[in-house]
């Protein structure tokens, strides 16, 4: 099973982002700077909707990535960050077992775009907001077979959408120093990935 949960915040002021996150998430009690890349390997699920463990880094000159341990859309958090920091916030989530993919863009306190699909059940796609200039008629990659046209919105689509905003969805964590925000009661149990045949974030 593979799960991906992340926020991307357009900012060059990482310290201001850290303070905004700490203010918005009362369960966060400790901030630890200059953590190595392998800190990103321990993102275990939170027991409640709000994350209580986050790691962030300035992985792009204009964008910070925040990995967190909540499989929640975090609408209030993303909207609040985009408003308080007067910027854009992108939320991405994916889950391989349920074949679930999520993308949302918040800008200056407004939800501008939201896409949500789950191919393992019959729920309808969420597709709200103005279509981006780079999108097809429907979100995702256009496929044609036997005269039939369909669209697949998956992990590759999430990566491509992020690139359109000027950053890579994934960068090698070992290339950066990370800031850890967590609840002091969080039980740390790092994963042993030395023998993994693929990166921790790739779930197929």
PLM ranges: what are they?
Residues 2, 61, 91, 176, ...:
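Short, low-complexity intrinsically disordered segments
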Residues 113-200, 204:
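Long, compositionally biased intrinsically disordered terminal regions
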Residues 1-29, 202-203:
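Short, extreme N-terminal segment that most often corresponds to the first beta-strand
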Residues 10, 14, 74, 151-154:
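Intrinsic-disorder-associated interaction segments
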Residues 27-118:
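Short, intrinsically disordered low-complexity segments
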Residues 16, 73-80, 157-160:
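Exposed alpha-helical structural elements
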Residues 18-24, 35-46, 173, 177-180, ...:
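Extended non-membrane alpha-helical scaffolds
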């Amino acid at each position: 099973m593979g799960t991906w949960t992340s926020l991307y915040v357009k900012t060059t002021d990482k310290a201001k982002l850290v303070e905004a996150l700490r203010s918005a998430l009362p369960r966060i009690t400790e901030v630890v700077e200059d953590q190595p890349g392998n800190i990103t390997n321990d993102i275990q699920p939170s027991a409640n909707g709000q994350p209580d463990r986050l790691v962030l880094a300035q992985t792009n000159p204009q964008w910070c990535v925040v990995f967190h341990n909540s499989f929640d859309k975090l609408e209030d958090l993303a909207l609040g960050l985009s408003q308080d920091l007067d910027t854009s916030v992108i939320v991405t989530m994916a889950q391989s077992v349920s074949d679930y993919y999520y993308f949302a863009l918040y800008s200056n306190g407004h939800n501008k775009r939201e896409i949500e699909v789950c191919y393992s059940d019959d729920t309808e796609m969420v597709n709200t907001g103005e279509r981006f200039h780079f999108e097809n008629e429907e979100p995702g990659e256009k496929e044609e077979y036997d005269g039939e046209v369909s669209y697949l919105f998956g992990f590759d689509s999430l990566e491509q959408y992020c690139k359109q905003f000027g950053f890579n969805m994934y960068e090698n964590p070992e290339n950066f120093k990370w800031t850890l925000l967590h609840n002091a009661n969080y039980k740390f149990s790092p994963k042993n990935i030395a023998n993994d045949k693929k990166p921790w974030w790739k779930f197929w």
